[in-house]
């Protein structure tokens, strides 16, 4: 999930239901094998059967359920380990049995969101920049290596 789009990534048609579309800034939870939580920052995509897009039915801020789930993932890992399967995963029952603390005053969570939201936005922006730089490197490096391009840079001044 953290690799984003690779050469092995299966492409998906844009004509998929909105319920399985993911966009930058979405919170994703991998419930099989890796059991991870992440802030998606790899562009538009589609979910597969092993990844959930996490949202709040009660209008809690994204940062609240992101960090709650991030803290709870160790509990899920213990549940998966207890099943003694070759590839750890959790079931729908595990999700339904799970509980998290919810503040009586949602304004606490919303105040936290005001502070954390810009950090989430920056994470997405930086990941987008990393992807652009990676593409540039991957296209320029072969040209440099085989002599089709050169740098006009004097290393002796460093």
PLM regions with names:
Residues 1-24:
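Sequence-specific dsDNA recognition surfaces
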Residues 29-30:
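A generic structural signal for residues embedded in beta-strands
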Residues 33-37:
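Short, charged beta-turn/beta-strand-edge "cap" motif at the junction between a beta-strand
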Residues 39-41, 84-89:
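Short beta-strand/turn micro-motifs at beta-sheet edges
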Residues 39-53:
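Short, compositionally biased
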Residues 44-46, 90-93:
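Short, flexible turn/loop "capping" segments at secondary-structure junctions
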Residues 56:
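Short, conserved catalytic or interaction motifs in soluble domains
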Residues 59-60, 67, 71-75, 81-84, ...:
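Amphipathic alpha-helical coiled-coil/heptad-repeat segments
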């Amino acid at each position: 999930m953290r690799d984003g789009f690779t050469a092995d990534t299966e492409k998906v048609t844009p004509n998929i239901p909105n319920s399985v579309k993911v966009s930058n800034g979405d919170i994703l939870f991998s419930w099989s094998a890796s059991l991870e939580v992440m802030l998606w920052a790899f562009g538009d995509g589609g979910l597969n059967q092993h990844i959930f897009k996490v949202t709040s039915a009660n209008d809690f801020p994204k940062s609240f359920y992101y960090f709650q789930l991030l803290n709870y993932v160790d509990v899920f890992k213990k549940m998966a380990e207890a099943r003694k399967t070759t590839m750890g995963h959790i079931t729908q029952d595990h999700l339904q049995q799970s509980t998290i603390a919810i503040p009586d005053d949602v304004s606490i969570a919303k105040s936290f969101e005001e502070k954390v939201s810009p950090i989430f936005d920056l994470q997405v922006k930086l990941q987008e920049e990393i992807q652009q730089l990676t593409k540039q490197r991957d296209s320029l490096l072969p040209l440099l290596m085989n002599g089709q391009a050169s740098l006009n840079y004097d290393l002796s001044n460093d």
